[in-house]
From Swiss-Prot:
Name of the gene: rpl4
GO cellular component, as recorded: ribonucleoprotein complex; ribosome
Gene3D superfamilies: 3.40.1370.10
InterPro entries named among the record's database cross-references: Ribosomal_uL4, Ribosomal_uL4_dom_sf, Ribosomal_uL4_euk/arc_CS, Ribosomal_uL4_euk/arch, Ribosomall_uL4-arc
Family membership noted in the UniProt record: Belongs to the universal ribosomal protein uL4 family.
Keyword RNA-binding applies: yes
PROSITE patterns attached to this UniProt entry: RIBOSOMAL_L1E
Gene Ontology biological process terms from the UniProt entry: translation
Keyword field: Ribonucleoprotein, Ribosomal protein, RNA-binding, rRNA-binding
Protein name: Large ribosomal subunit protein uL4
Domain of life from the UniProt record: Archaea
Length: 249
């Protein structure tokens, strides 16, 4: 399988042979399993205070009064301590000893990564994820792209190859998050757009574009290729990155 290598102006420079990994079987089940396993490494243990809800001075009345046998506050008939009482303990509070990490076999993880890479060259899968682009997949840019230093130069190159519309889609998607999260440092939600995979230089000029992630091919992982377990992210490869995927140095 071959792909066209594009210049910064969008013209075809030459063709390159794609590595066999781009022909891997599509396995959304393994991709989801691998992403969840990776996300679980960031979970933090949570636990309730041991004496929460049970510090009240309350005793049961015993039988013979025609009321339930729950602990009641002294000099009062108000129930306390039990889960169904106001201010009582929680029935099943979070435990710090709960195992949060989800593991995955190494072979499954490797196969999931290969499958996620292969999904990036399927126009049907990429469009079904909501991405906007013109032209054919995969997008492979010449090595000059990695040397860009200005964001406006990166934007011009993305416009030339026909993928900047997806960045604009991510810009329009920004909205205030519902719920308490907006008070906890995550006020806005925004869709993911382009993933740029480079071979040698991490393209810092693209880091402020809406929804764009940049990574070296050596650091590529399943979650970058399938955010939220949804595979087939619109991905832009540099020529050096493709050669490294094929085992070339």
């Amino acid at each position: 399988m071959k792909a066209q290598v594009l210049t910064l102006t969008g013209s075809v420079a030459h063709e390159i042979e794609l590595p066999p990994v781009f022909s891997s079987e599509f396995r959304p089940d393994l991709i989801k399993k691998a992403v969840i396993a990776q996300q679980s490494r960031r979970y933090q243990p949570h636990g309730a205070y041991v004496y929460a809800g049970i510090t009240a001075s309350a005793v049961g009345w015993g039988s013979g009064r025609g009321v339930s046998h729950v602990p009641r506050l002294k000099n009062s008939s108000r129930a306390a301590k039990v889960p169904q009482a106001k201010g009582g303990r929680e029935a099943h509070p979070p435990k710090v000893e709960k195992v949060l990490i989800r593991n995955i076999n190494q072979k499954e993880k490797r196969k999931a990564l290969n499958s996620a890479i292969a999904a990036t060259i399927s126009p049907e899968l990429v469009r079904s994820r909501g991405h906007v682009f013109t032209g054919s997949l995969p997008y492979v840019l010449s090595g000059d792209f990695e040397s860009l230093k200005k964001t406006k130069e990166v934007i011009a190159a993305l416009r030339a190859v026909g993928v900047y519309g997806d960045v604009e889609r991510a810009e329009r998607s920004r909205k205030v998050r519902a719920g308490r999260g907006k008070l906890r440092g995550r006020r806005y939600k925004q869709r993911k757009s382009l993933l740029i995979v480079t071979g040698k230089e991490r393209l810092r000029a693209a880091r402020n574009l809406a929804g764009v992630d940049v990574c070296l091919v050596d650091n590529l992982n399943v979650e970058l290729l399938a955010p939220g377990t949804h595979s087939a992210r619109l991905t832009l490869w540099t020529e050096d990155a493709v050669r490294k995927l094929g085992g070339e140095q």
